[in-house]
């Protein structure tokens, strides 16, 4: 128990409170000079309130002359007035609220403006305009003149144009050759969008690719493939998807054929492929061509948006990605590759086919805005030369670097990103793993060493249990508020992020900073500690150490290429915190003497303490500015760069499923937190005026997010259309989209209102819905109205069937003749009582169909004779061709679907053989029909932007779609739902 008087206790308490504040001078009492426990630190991080008190201390308390003389003598080394210049430097660059606030505001503005400026700069076309760009733009105009899906006459016209262009270019050089490809392929294609699906879809496809080979000077080198597809979907002109890729390839070919261009060292093969949109088939059939045998590397050009910059978002390995560092305007990020791999983006490109065939290469694509992708807004009107040149010039630089140089054999996965479109950074995942391990060990060791030095020298007075919980508690509260508000946005209207991700990002970032400011400022006021920013930096560094450890495990287990930013954050926080510790470790210890008696009454004690504060204010340190510059600007730049890129890529995926919407909002919240996290070490020193501004910004941004239109012309709602024609003459229109948004569009259609047509809407899984109504009948082929009746467009005949119900343990053989007038592709689906294609009653049961055949030669309208009834025993697994030219595919696991694509318009008939086994273990005692095989034949038509001549009168092919396009609101766009825009379906039982 203390024997001191209350006044002594008050003075000691005041002194202790002062010691635990933010002093920077070491002081000791004359009463006990050698007692280390009496030392304390006066922090450089002075409060502005102390500045205000500086002018008042002259008049504060009339002390006795003797006492005043003692105080002055003890502090005379610190009482000299600094020069005007020194005071200017201190007021401008000291750790003051105004200075810090200005630095924070400038950092955020810098990051936003510099990103926009450099993006604009990267789209500038050099002057004069390159000749290959001028020609490529003309090519693009011709290619995207009409909507040209695979099953359209316009598709043939595009094919002929590309073939003519390439042949004319090839004619200028003896080592360039161009040809049309007529290869065929029959293969098993898994579900492209669901890796867990066990569906086996057998596809027969006839190629209409256009191939060009530029022979290199060294035939021993493996060839480079450059690829893009020239077909569009049925509802789009395909200007960006993928006309720009085709036009870029033609421009590159023009450059290679130029008389000033040297012949490349390795062969460069161009694959202008067809039918990518419905199954990546043009890339798949390429491997049936002999030129594919020599190909080892590839560059795939795609378009999943409608302009902007073309991003390199996937690469197979470090060796191949290293060559991208030589392009003139790099734009790439492996974060998108991880998002693609993780299912955040539901699309696929030919990259997948080439990579699965063991090729090494990259995927370059346009990526925004996704809501215009596959709609008629993807047209030449919405395109520009700048976007075309960005893809063409970068692809040209990459192709030249790969074609003229040796290629690194580093096959390890790579992380990569660009810096403002000026520099390209890449390194292997193995090297990142090593770097992370090194940092996880080195940084803690350095921190501990410096902390021990600081503790020994008593230059940082902070208790082991005091002040260390404010950062985690405040951060948890801030993240909780951000999460709650983000969830409120989501539940209020999940579609708001589809139109605009920037406004809610501003709202959530402002909210995070406000809550953090309140929490940390309150903690600093209640329990002030010496150098709070350093304490928070160390805690932030510890948090990032854990995150880096997790990211390192992800690298080892899953080859995750998207978490590289965590390593950057850890490095930045480490540099900033280590610098703070180093500054304390090297700081000289200055001592002042306190009077021996702290128990005198009156204002003497208060005067001494006030003079101590004045002295502290005159010992300035500017290490905060270095810490700020090491941490905040680069952190914000990294976060905004990959965060903005990611949000632009995924924000409109909410229209595809609620699950993707959840991911989008979570990612939005994560970016908002990351944008605020780097400022937390300094946030308690922000000017209160800025917090008011942040509150206003948060309120305005939230209001704009909640009350603004969900969709607009630039960010429309996307609905998907298909029309089914039934044998009974029904013409059902199916419109698919987000549940609740379809009905208003259908309600306003003239045919629905005038004819009082009923429609039914069904809520499907994952927030989607489908509405069905009777639409205007389609006119699919030229001729008479009778020729457009169902029975004259699609007929399915059973030519033979061995399922008599008597044989049990041998395969059944059935032959079908399918006549589909002017349809280029038909899909066969199979079902029994226990199995249905795509929706098996028992998901563990194999499909009954074991073999499908496509006959090209017939004998008396029947297939050629087989050796005996045990056909399955004589056919190898997989694809084979018999002596009659019949394509056969056998799969013992069972075949779920069979898709037949053809290229000849006049070849209306498909002849298909099916061999199947009934599962007799499930034999029913009921009707014989329980042992039958059901076959659904569905044939598609994709042309709509054309007319059919019906009995001498021109009629639009699919008027129901025309009506929907014409009367849908300006903020609604229409895309295709299925393989075509209309289909006919017939069911037979074997």
Curated annotation (Swiss-Prot):
Residue ranges with Polar residues bias: 17-30, 65-75
SUPFAM superfamilies the record matches: Zn-dependent exopeptidases (SSF53187)
Keywords from the named record: Glycoprotein, Hydrolase, Membrane, Metal-binding, Metalloprotease, Protease, Transmembrane, Transmembrane helix, Vacuole, Zinc
Residue segments, region Disordered: 1-75
Composition-biased stretches (Acidic residues): 34-49
CDD domains: M28_Fxna_like
Record: active site: 276 (proton acceptor)
Top-level EC class as recorded in UniProt: hydrolase
Residues reported to bind Zn(2+) 1: 229, 241, 302
Molecular function terms, GO-annotated: metal ion binding; metalloexopeptidase activity
Binding annotation for Zn(2+) 2: 241, 277, 374
Record bears the keyword Transcription regulation: no
Record text on cofactor binding: Binds 2 Zn(2+) ions per subunit.
InterPro entries documented for this protein: Fxna-like_M28_dom, M28_fam, Peptidase_M28, PFF1_C, PFF1_TM
Protein name: Vacuolar membrane protease
